[in-house]
């Protein structure tokens, strides 16, 4: 084989290899994107199941953090749009950690751990009866949850009486793909969930 023939053969090999890579690379990206989308759906399902199940079993909720560490009520904070404390047989606070994009789970004592990663939005809205228990539910204006009148709950914590009327929570959750390079291929996943407090006095 002459030098010219060798150069031509090398050029053809490079072109063929480039063509193969041009086909294989997008296919690999699609496969990775499909895997990441499946992972995102699983994370979303896990978050949705945990949040809705805990709210449904709750006696009441608080729109702020409660516990031995960084208790919002003790700091005079009685509303956070991205936080809910669920009170039942146990007390658990769920909140969005904005700087790390994580859904956090706090047990009210010393355990404060991430539950779901790559959460880009988490908000809680509340519904309560218009008057007596059993009447139509309406969205609760956050301002009414911090303006009193005030009472004490069973744990002797100060609480707005309107908070005790909450009998349904609307949860808005949005997750993103884990790999930044795949986010153009994998759209964020959104869900809005409604969970009624089955053990609330106002739900009876």
Question: What are the residue ranges of the model-derived segments?
Answer:
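Short linear sequence signals and composition-biased patches located at protein termini or domain-edge surfaces
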Residues: 113-204
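Aliphatic-rich helix starts adjacent to a transmembrane/signal segment
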Residues: 1-56, 204
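Alpha-helix initiation/capping motif
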Residues: 33, 37-40, 108, 112, ...
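Surface-exposed loop/linker segments characteristic of extracytoplasmic
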Residues: 45, 67-131, 188, 192-196
């Amino acid at each position: 084989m002459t030098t010219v023939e060798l150069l031509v053969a090398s050029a053809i090999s490079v072109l063929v290899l480039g063509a193969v890579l041009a086909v294989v690379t997008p296919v690999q990206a699609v496969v990775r994107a499909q895997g990441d989308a499946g992972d995102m759906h699983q994370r979303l399902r896990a978050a949705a199941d945990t949040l809705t199940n805990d709210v449904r079993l709750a006696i009441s909720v608080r729109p702020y953090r409660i516990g031995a560490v960084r208790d919002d009520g003790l700091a005079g904070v009685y509303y956070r749009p991205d936080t809910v404390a669920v009170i039942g047989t146990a007390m658990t606070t769920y909140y969005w950690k904005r700087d790390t994009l994580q859904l956090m789970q706090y047990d009210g004592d010393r355990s404060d751990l991430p539950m779901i990663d790559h959460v880009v939005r988490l908000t809680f809205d509340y519904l309560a009866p218009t008057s007596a228990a059993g009447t139509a539910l309406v969205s609760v204006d956050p301002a009414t949850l911090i303006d009193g009148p005030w009472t004490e709950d069973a744990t002797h914590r100060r609480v707005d009486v309107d908070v005790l009327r909450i009998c349904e929570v609307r949860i808005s959750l949005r997750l993103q793909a884990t790999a930044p390079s795949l986010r153009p291929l994998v759209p964020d996943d959104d869900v809005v969930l409604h969970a009624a407090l089955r053990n609330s006095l106002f739900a009876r």
